[in-house]
C-alpha cells in the first residue's frame, strides 16, 4: 500500500473502471477510483508454543517494550508490510510516539529478521520467542509442517494498532499504453476462482464481494488500513523507512 499511496500522491495513477471497483465493498477501493484491494493481511504476533501460551502474551503491541520480553521479539524492519504498518502507526499516533516505541523495542533487544517468513520459521523451531508478522505465513507453515512447526498466531486487542488489517492493493499507471489489458488483470484478480485461491491456498482474506474466507481464518474485527488515507500512507512511507533505519534495528 505504501508504494501505491506514494504513486497516488504524485498523481501517477490512472482511473479504474466502475465495473472493477464495484467488485469489492466501498471501503476496499479508493474514493478517487485509482486503486482496488484484492486481499487482506492481518498483522499478528507469532509465538513459540513451547515458550508462551496466549494468556501470557500482551494485550497491545505497546506492551512488547516491557522488560519481560527483552530479547524475545523479532521485527522484519526492511519488509514492505512492516514499513506499511509502521507508516500507519506514525499516522495514528504521531511521529514522536511511534519513534519512541521503536527505539524502546531496540533498547529491549528486539531482533532483526529480513522478512515475515524467516520470523515464522525461527519461531517454529524455537530460535526466537515471537515476532511481528502477517497472519498468513504461519498458516502456510503449519500446513506444510504440521508435526514439527511449533508456533501459533496471536492477535492483540481488536482496535490495537498491532492488529491492523493491511489491504493488498492493485492499480494501473496513468501513463499505461495497455489500459484495457490492465483493467482485465484487475478484474481477474477479483474473480471467484482467484479469490478462492488466495484464501484456500495462501490463507489471505478475500476482498471480492461474496467470497467466503477460509474457515481456518478467524473473523475479522481488526483495524483496517482501508480506513487510512492512502495519500498520507504514500507520503509517509519514505519517512517511516528513515525512522526504521535510524532506530538501529537493522543492526540487531
Cite the ranges covered by each PLM segment.
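A bilobed periplasmic-binding-protein/Venus flytrap-type ligand-binding module shared by bacterial periplasmic
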Residues: 44-51, 166-178, 197
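An extracytoplasmic/periplasmic, membrane-proximal ligand-sensing/linker region
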Residues: 96, 204-252
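Periplasmic-binding protein-like
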Residues: 23-26, 41, 69-78, 102-106, 112-113, 188-212, ...
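Extracytoplasmic ligand-binding site segments that recognize negatively charged/polar headgroups
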Residues: 1-128
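Short amphipathic alpha-helical coupling segments at ligand-binding clamshell hinges
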Residues: 97, 101, 168, 177-189, ...
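A ligand-binding cleft/hinge motif common to bilobed small-molecule-binding domains
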Residues: 2-7, 129-151
Amino acid at each position: 500500500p505504501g508504494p501505491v499511496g506514494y504513486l497516488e500522491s504524485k498523481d501517477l495513477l490512472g482511473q479504474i473502471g466502475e465495473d472493477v471497483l464495484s467488485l469489492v465493498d466501498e471501503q476496499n477501493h479508493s474514493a478517487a477510483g485509482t486503486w482496488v484491494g484484492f486481499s487482506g493481511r492481518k498483522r499478528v504476533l507469532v509465538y513459540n508454543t513451547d515458550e508462551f501460551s496466549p494468556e501470557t502474551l500482551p494485550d497491545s503491541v505497546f506492551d512488547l517494550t516491557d522488560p519481560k520480553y527483552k530479547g524475545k521479539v523479532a521485527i522484519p524492519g526492511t519488509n514492505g508490510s512492516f514499513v506499511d504498518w509502521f507508516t500507519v502507526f506514525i499516522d495514528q499516533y504521531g511521529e514522536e510516539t511511534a519513534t519512541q516505541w521503536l527505539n524502546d523495542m531496540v533498547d529491549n533487544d528486539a531482533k532483526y529478521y529480513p522478512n515475515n517468513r524467516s520470523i515464522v520459521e525461527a519461531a517454529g523451531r524455537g530460535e526466537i520467542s515471537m515476532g511481528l508478522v502477517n497472519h498468513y505465513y504461519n498458516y502456510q507453515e503449519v500446513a506444510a509442517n504440521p508435526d514439527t512447526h511449533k508456533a501459533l498466531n496471536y492477535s492483540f486487542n481488536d482496535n490495537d494498532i498491532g492488529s491492523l488489517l493491511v489491504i493488498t492493493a492493485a492499480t494501473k499507471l496513468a501513463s499505461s499504453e495497455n489500459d484495457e489489458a490492465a483493467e482485465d488483470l484487475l478484474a481477474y484478480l477479483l474473480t471467484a476462482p482467484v479469490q478462492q485461491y488466495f484464501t484456500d491456498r495462501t490463507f489471505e482474506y478475500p476482498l471480492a464481494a461474496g467470497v467466503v474466507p477460509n474457515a481456518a481464518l478467524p473473523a475479522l474485527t481488526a483495524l483496517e488500513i482501508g480506513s487510512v488515507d492512502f495519500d498520507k500512507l504514500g507520503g509517509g512511507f519514505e519517512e517511516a523507512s528513515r525512522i526504521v533505519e535510524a532506530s538501529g534495528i537493522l543492526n540487531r
